[in-house]
Each structure stands twice: as structure tokens, then as C-alpha cells.
Amino acid sequence: MSILLQGERFKKRLMPILLSMALAGCSNLLGSNFTQTLQKDANASSEFYINKLGQTQELEDQQTYKLLAARVLIRENKVEQSAALLRELGELNDAQKLDRALIEARISAAKNANEVAQNQLRALDLNKLSPSQKSRYYETLAIVAENRKDMIEAVKARIEMDKNLTDVQRHQDNIDKTWALLRSANTGVINNASDEGNAALGGWLTLIKAYNDYIRQPVQLSQALQSWKNAYPNHAAATLFPKELLTLLNFQQTNVSQIGLLLPLSGDGQILGTTIQSGFNDAKGNSTIPVQVFDTSMNSVQDIIAQAKQAGIKTLVGPLLKQNLDVILADPAQIQGMDVLALNATPNSRAIPQLCYYGLSPEDEAESAANKMWNDGVRNPLVAMPQNDLGQRVGNAFNVRWQQLAGTDANIRYYNLPADVTYFVQENNSNTTALYAVASPTELAEMKGYLTNIVPNLAIYASSRASASATNTNTDFIAQMNGVQFSDIPFFKDTNSPQYQKLAKSTGGEYQLMRLYAMGADAWLLINQFNELRQVPGYRLSGLTGILSADTNCNVERDMTWYQYQDGAIVPVAN
């Protein structure tokens, strides 16, 4: 009996020791309470987590902070820094290993290593993931599908992701990204897609089909969107509607009663103003909408706006000159209640309600060139820009668009002399298959002469600056440029049209004046579709200066027409 009692006493003394050992083992597997934050959303910046890393003495907590920082660095588009931080990790417990695996898959997806990312995800047990971690799992799946241009699979992954989100802002971001995927998908893919019994997918497909069906009829589109919300009251996108579509729910068709046209019609800018006015008036034709013209060379912009308001004018086209536009931008309250289509943009341009910016910007051409080269299969372009302010602006515009397309910087070089391009090409000869140059006709002819001897198969793309001779019969120049492609306004596409012939005669074939005329004509087109342009995402107009659309700040963008010098002729080519 005494032996049994001693045994019971021994068990009681041993139990706390065994329990503490068991808990220590669990801690090694699952980590401390702080490590459990890996199962939640990381809402701070990478800088915050890195600072915390330097303040903690606990090794386990240091690893957790590194994982949190690595996760956020990807969100901040600092993928290489995230990968480097993972390489610094020491010994991890099971909870940390699980989170590292999620981050590694996300890094692989960011690097377009899609098969690797998919295999890394397959190795994970979904049952061991928290809702927050599951949302990250499905986000990586969505990115892999998007990388593969499989937009429907990407949407399906984001639907699963949405089920695991708890934060309202993350819900909204996911809704907006899902909508962006559908908007970017080919209409044929959308029309042939099946909802596979997935009610959420069915709702999304119905929404994008309604959008595609009525994009050219904004009033009907607005009604269709409201009908969709009524038909799918429990859909995630009905609760948090895609931000891009919100303004369409209360869309009002453009209704212009009278227009104020603000142009320099005397002094130094007279020829610019009168040429734009001519294009505007010709496009107006027999329209009964009254147009009152204001000379910005004779009166201040503030006085003109006051006069327009007194006359009951609520729609303005202009001003043209940058200094006059800056007057409006310095005090936007003066145009409150008015629709304004400015005919320029300045460094101070920003998003202001009911104000859009339209001009013949060389930056538009650079973006069009990036699109064209990418569509032509160019992956490592050499971009030659003049060493001046124009070159810096256009080079930056090209690079921004190239980053969006390729995920990397373009090789932008700046020249002082046309001969400089030979050095640029020689430095990158093994990789460069195409050149985009902003240059005058004389400069481009000199560049091409050098390059023909060094890299005869180099594809050359140029801006409209190099096509200034295209409107005359300079056959020597055209022959020398054989094979060169250049962008310009579509107005020059049909040189036999009565409108072109009339304008060529009245301007003496002056290239820049013809472009300003086309700009004036498109200003009439744009102001009469002002609400559609501002409020309907993806709304496009076919104008004389390009295919016109507006970005989120209502900068009017122009998709250019591309031409090529071929055997002594200038012919349009596919964009």
C-alpha cells in the first residue's frame, strides 16, 4: 500500500514537469503568441516591421518580424528585397515555416515563375491556413493565372480569396482587381465562359457582359448596372461596387446648351488660335449650339470666365496657352459648376472635377510607341531621346508605359548628336533588335545612315517629329527612310480626302498647322461627349488626332496611327 501511495505522489510531482515539457514542444511547433500574428493581415509598412525587428531581443520574434516585412515588401513592389530578407531567416518553428512558404510562392508569382509558384502552393495544406493566409494563397493563384493570361481562372481565384477577407478595404481592392481582370479579358473569352455552377462567377460574367454590350450607350449602361444590382443583391460586387463603375450609376448624358471657346486670336498666338478655331468650326458644321469666342490675348482668363458665367455659359473649351491654364489651376473654384476642356496641360495639372486636359502631347506618342513595340514582339528596346527637357519628358513617359507592359525599365539613352546612337547600339548590340527615336527628319536621316552600316536589320520606330516631311514630295527623304515606322495622327491617313485636300491648300501643307486644325475638330467632338468621356471607363472616340480616351485624372489620351516608309510610299500599318 505504501508503495502505491509513493507512486501516486511521484506522478503528481512529475506531472508539472511533463506538462511544461509538452508546452515547450508545442511552442517550438506553433511559436509564441506574437508568432500567431502571422495568421493575420499585415497592415503596417515594411519599414515599421524592420524597425521593430531592430528593437526586439527575442530570436523567434525577430524571425516573425522578418516574415511580416518580407510579406509587405512584395506589396510595395520590392520583390528582390523581400527575397533577400527571407534568405536572412534562421531556424523557424512550424507556423513560421508555413508563412515563409506562402511568401516564397508569392515571390515566384511576382517573378512570373508560374510553375514554381503553383508547385509551392500545392505543397501547402489548406486546412492549416487561417482565413487571412487562405486569402494570400488564392491571391497568388490569381496572379499565376493572370500571368498566363487566363483571366477566368484568375477571377475564380479572386472569388475564393474574397470569401476569406474580413477587412472592408481589402474587400474593395479585391473587387476592383476582379473587375479589372474582366475588363482586360477578350470579349470572345467572356462570351464563351461558363459559370460552372458558381453563382459568384455567374454574377461577374453577367456584369461584364452588360458593360460590353452597352459601352457605347452610357444611358442604357447605367440602367443595366442598376438592374444587375437588383438581380444580384447578395453578390460581393453588389455590396461593394467596383469603384470604376460608381459614377455610372447616376450617369447623365452630355447636354451642351452653349459653349465658350477660349483661344489666343490676336498677338503672338494668333495663328495657333485661328487654326484651332477653324477646325472647331468645321467640325461644328450645321449644329445649332451657340458658340461664343473669347480672345485670351485681349482679356484675362478670370475676366473671360466671369463674362461666360454672366452669359449663362456652362461649357468652356480652352484655354490653349499654359500660363492661362495655370490661372485656372491656381483657383479651381472659379470654374465650379462648369465643364471645361482645357487644350493643354501643365506640370500643375491634377484631377479637378469637371476639368479635362486635351492636347497634342508628345508623351502620348511615347506611350503609343511602347504599346506598338510590345505588340510587335520587341522585348529589349533601345530608346534614343534628345538631351533636353522634351527628351526627359518623353523618355519618362515611354518608360512608365514600358514598366506597365514588361515589368522592367526600358533602356533610355539621351543623345547630343545623332552619331551618339551608334555608341548606344554598340553597347547593347547583342540584345537590341529595335530602336525608338524622337528626332527631327534631318537627325533621323543621319541616325539611319549610321545604323544601316552597323546593324542593317535593326527595326526603327520614330515619333511624328520625324514625319514632318511626310506631307510633301521629298522623294529622296522617303527613299532613305525605307522600313522606318512612325506614329502620327490618323488625319494624315487619307491624303486624298476632300477635307485633307482643302486643309493642305489653305495651310500651304504646313504640317504643324494641319495638326492644330485636327485638334480643333476633335475638341468639338470631345466637348459634346464630355460626360461619357469622364464617367464611362473605357469609353473611346475615333478622332482626327487619334483614338481618344480619358484616364482617371481626365487627361485625354491618344492612341496614334502608325505608318511606314515602303518603297517610296507612306503606308498605314497595324498598331
From Swiss-Prot:
Disulfide bonds join 356-554. Pfam families: LppC. It comes from the Bacteria. Belongs to the LpoA family. It is a lipid-anchor. It comes from Haemophilus influenzae (strain ATCC 51907 / DSM 11121 / KW20 / Rd). A lipid is attached at residue 26 (S-diacylglycerol cysteine). Residues 1-25 form the signal peptide. A lipid is attached at residue 26 (N-palmitoyl cysteine). It is found in: Cell outer membrane. One of its GO terms (cellular component) is periplasmic side of cell outer membrane. Its main location: membrane. GO terms for biological process: peptidoglycan biosynthetic process; regulation of cell shape. Keywords: Cell outer membrane, Cell shape, Disulfide bond, Lipoprotein, Membrane, Palmitate, Peptidoglycan synthesis, Signal. InterPro entries: LpoA (IPR007443), Peripla_BP_I (IPR028082), TPR-like_helical_dom_sf (IPR011990). GO terms for molecular function: enzyme regulator activity. Interacts with PBP1a. Regulator of peptidoglycan synthesis that is essential for the function of penicillin-binding protein 1A (PBP1a). This is Penicillin-binding protein activator LpoA.
